[in-house]
Design a protein with these regions (language model features):
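Non-catalytic, topology-defining segments of multipass membrane proteins
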Residues: 1-185, 190
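Active-site-proximal inter-transmembrane loops
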Residues: 127-135, 194-220, 226-227
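Residues that scaffold the ATP/ADP-binding catalytic core of kinase and kinase-like folds
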Residues: 48, 223-224
Length: 227
């Protein structure tokens, strides 16, 4: 997925744009869909479910569940199960799933390319609370279908509406997915390398205003890891 979306975003999208051009509608829907995906991860997957930082109405939780599937970062249950050990064992190479001390590329994307075993891949014992959430479990059960419908269906629908299916698939589909993925991944990698540490130096997390802007506040990572 990462390779395919990267090729389409970095090669196919610019080439298509050079020959056929893009309009205001491509830019508008890119911003809307990118924001929807990243907010669903930040406010939904991360703060609401993984950290239980606040409570939300079922309608908002449903919207976040759809947006999270659109972001293509696995289900709420799986994402939260990976993330909770990161905070509990931050920078521990043996227990932190994406420990920054194992290097930039590992914490950015390499940790997702590791060998998986069936028993550990589906072990959600650290998220028993989330298994009581009907929306979380509904999304987990239907994640693949939801991911396919949102990632292909939304771009196709917009393409039909505006008369440019290929252009919308490249911008709202591939480019949006590529940038949404890597802006999130940069929090696991770059936000543990580049930035300031005004709140704690006990771990590698850093505050980075530039990353915070593109990730709806996630770049204030030093603050997040201490509070």
């Amino acid at each position: 997925v990462f390779l395919f979306s990267g090729v389409l975003a970095l090669i196919a999208a610019p080439v298509y744009g050079y020959y056929y051009g893009y309009g205001w509608e491509h830019a508008l829907w890119f911003i809307i869909t990118f924001s929807f995906c990243n907010l669903s991860i930040t406010a939904g997957y991360h703060r609401l479910w993984a950290h239980k930082a606040y409570q939300a109405h079922s309608s908002l939780r449903f919207v976040y569940a759809i947006g999270g599937a659109f972001a293509l970062q696995n289900s709420v249950l799986h994402w939260s199960s990976d993330h909770r050990p990161h905070h509990k064992f931050v920078d521990n190479n043996d227990k932190d799933p994406y420990s920054a001390k194992r290097g930039f590329w590992y914490s950015h994307i390499g940790w997702m390319l590791r060998n998986y075993t069936e028993d550990t891949y589906s072990d959600y014992s650290n998220c028993r609370d989330l298994q009581k959430d009907k929306i979380v479990m509904w999304q987990h059960k239907h994640y693949l279908a939801l991911a396919l419908i949102t990632n292909v269906g939304i771009a196709l629908l917009l393409g039909v509406i505006y008369g440019d299916i290929v252009g919308m698939l490249l911008i709202v589909g591939a480019l949006r997915l590529f940038l949404s993925h890597h802006s999130t991944f940069f929090i696991n990698s770059l936000a543990h390398i580049w930035g300031s540490q005004p709140y704690t130096t006990k771990n590698t997390a850093r505050d980075n205003g530039l990353l915070a802007f593109f990730t709806f506040g996630e770049g204030y990572h030093n603050f997040h890891h201490i509070f």
